[in-house]
Protein backbone atom coordinates (compact mmCIF):
# COMPACT_ATOMS: atom_id res chain seq x y z
CA UNK A 1 0.00 0.00 0.00
CA UNK A 2 1.21 3.46 -0.84
CA UNK A 3 1.62 6.12 1.87
CA UNK A 4 -0.99 8.87 2.23
CA UNK A 5 1.61 11.49 1.34
CA UNK A 6 1.89 9.92 -2.10
CA UNK A 7 -1.83 10.34 -2.70
CA UNK A 8 -1.69 13.92 -1.41
CA UNK A 9 1.05 14.57 -3.95
CA UNK A 10 -1.26 13.28 -6.70
CA UNK A 11 -4.01 15.58 -5.41
CA UNK A 12 -1.56 18.49 -5.63
CA UNK A 13 -0.71 17.46 -9.20
CA UNK A 14 -4.42 17.50 -10.06
CA UNK A 15 -4.73 21.04 -8.69
CA UNK A 16 -1.71 22.18 -10.68
CA UNK A 17 -3.14 20.48 -13.76
CA UNK A 18 -6.34 22.52 -13.38
CA UNK A 19 -4.38 25.74 -12.80
CA UNK A 20 -2.31 25.24 -15.95
CA UNK A 21 -3.78 22.83 -18.51
CA UNK A 22 -7.37 23.22 -17.33
CA UNK A 23 -7.19 26.99 -17.47
CA UNK A 24 -5.67 26.91 -20.94
CA UNK A 25 -8.36 24.49 -22.13
CA UNK A 26 -11.34 26.33 -20.67
CA UNK A 27 -10.39 30.02 -20.74
CA UNK A 28 -7.59 30.07 -23.32
CA UNK A 29 -5.30 31.64 -20.69
CA UNK A 30 -1.64 30.61 -20.73
CA UNK A 31 -0.23 31.04 -17.23
CA UNK A 32 3.49 30.31 -17.59
CA UNK A 33 4.02 30.40 -13.83
CA UNK A 34 1.36 27.71 -13.33
CA UNK A 35 2.98 25.57 -16.02
CA UNK A 36 6.33 26.03 -14.27
CA UNK A 37 4.88 24.91 -10.94
CA UNK A 38 3.27 21.91 -12.66
CA UNK A 39 6.60 21.00 -14.30
CA UNK A 40 8.43 21.23 -10.96
CA UNK A 41 5.78 19.11 -9.24
CA UNK A 42 5.97 16.44 -11.96
CA UNK A 43 9.76 16.32 -11.67
CA UNK A 44 9.49 15.93 -7.89
CA UNK A 45 6.77 13.30 -8.25
CA UNK A 46 8.94 11.24 -10.60
CA UNK A 47 11.73 11.20 -8.03
CA UNK A 48 9.29 10.22 -5.28
CA UNK A 49 7.72 7.50 -7.46
CA UNK A 50 11.02 5.67 -7.90
CA UNK A 51 10.66 4.38 -4.34
CA UNK A 52 7.40 2.57 -5.17
CA UNK A 53 6.74 -0.41 -7.41
CA UNK A 54 3.27 0.78 -8.44
CA UNK A 55 1.92 4.05 -9.83
CA UNK A 56 -1.77 4.92 -9.43
CA UNK A 57 -3.71 5.19 -12.68
CA UNK A 58 -4.79 8.69 -11.73
CA UNK A 59 -1.19 9.92 -11.86
CA UNK A 60 -0.59 8.26 -15.22
CA UNK A 61 -3.82 9.76 -16.54
CA UNK A 62 -2.87 13.29 -15.43
CA UNK A 63 0.51 13.11 -17.11
CA UNK A 64 -0.74 11.45 -20.30
CA UNK A 65 -3.73 13.79 -20.64
CA UNK A 66 -1.43 16.78 -20.22
CA UNK A 67 0.93 15.51 -22.91
CA UNK A 68 -1.87 14.77 -25.37
CA UNK A 69 -3.61 18.09 -24.77
CA UNK A 70 -0.41 20.07 -25.30
CA UNK A 71 0.43 18.21 -28.49
CA UNK A 72 -3.01 18.82 -29.98
CA UNK A 73 -3.28 22.43 -28.79
CA UNK A 74 0.20 23.67 -29.63
CA UNK A 75 -0.63 24.11 -33.30
CA UNK A 76 -3.45 26.55 -32.50
CA UNK A 77 -1.86 28.33 -29.55
CA UNK A 78 -0.36 31.81 -29.60
CA UNK A 79 2.78 30.39 -28.00
CA UNK A 80 3.24 27.21 -30.04
CA UNK A 81 6.82 26.58 -29.02
CA UNK A 82 6.14 26.77 -25.27
CA UNK A 83 3.10 24.48 -25.43
CA UNK A 84 4.81 21.98 -27.75
CA UNK A 85 7.89 21.86 -25.50
CA UNK A 86 5.70 21.28 -22.44
CA UNK A 87 3.90 18.48 -24.29
CA UNK A 88 7.25 16.85 -25.10
CA UNK A 89 8.27 17.18 -21.45
CA UNK A 90 5.03 15.53 -20.30
CA UNK A 91 5.35 12.70 -22.84
CA UNK A 92 8.83 11.98 -21.57
CA UNK A 93 7.58 12.22 -17.97
CA UNK A 94 4.84 9.69 -18.75
CA UNK A 95 7.27 7.09 -20.04
CA UNK A 96 9.71 7.71 -17.18
CA UNK A 97 6.89 7.36 -14.65
CA UNK A 98 5.75 4.10 -16.24
CA UNK A 99 9.31 2.73 -16.18
CA UNK A 100 10.11 3.80 -12.61
CA UNK A 101 12.74 6.35 -13.57
CA UNK A 102 13.21 10.10 -13.33
CA UNK A 103 14.90 12.74 -15.47
CA UNK A 104 18.29 12.24 -13.82
CA UNK A 105 18.43 8.57 -14.79
CA UNK A 106 19.02 9.21 -18.49
CA UNK A 107 21.57 11.56 -19.99
CA UNK A 108 21.41 12.52 -23.67
CA UNK A 109 24.37 11.34 -25.71
CA UNK A 110 25.54 8.85 -23.10
CA UNK A 111 24.98 5.13 -23.71
CA UNK A 112 22.75 3.47 -21.17
CA UNK A 113 24.35 0.56 -19.35
CA UNK A 114 22.00 -1.67 -17.41
Stretches with model-predicted labels:
Residues 21-31, 52, 76, 80-83:
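Alpha-helical rod/repeat scaffolding segments in eukaryotic adaptors/tethers
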Residues 27, 45-49, 73:
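Alpha-helix C-capping/helix-to-loop hinge sites
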Residues 6-13, 20, 59, 66, ...:
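Generic structural signal of hydrophobic/aromatic residues within well-ordered alpha-helices
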Residues 17-20, 31, 49-52, 97, ...:
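Short secondary-structure junctions and interdomain/linker hinges
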Residues 62-114:
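Amphipathic alpha-helical binding modules
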Amino acid sequence: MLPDSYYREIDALAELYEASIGRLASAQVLDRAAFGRFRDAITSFLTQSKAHSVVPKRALLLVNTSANFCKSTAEFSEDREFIAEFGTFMTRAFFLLASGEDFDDRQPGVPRII
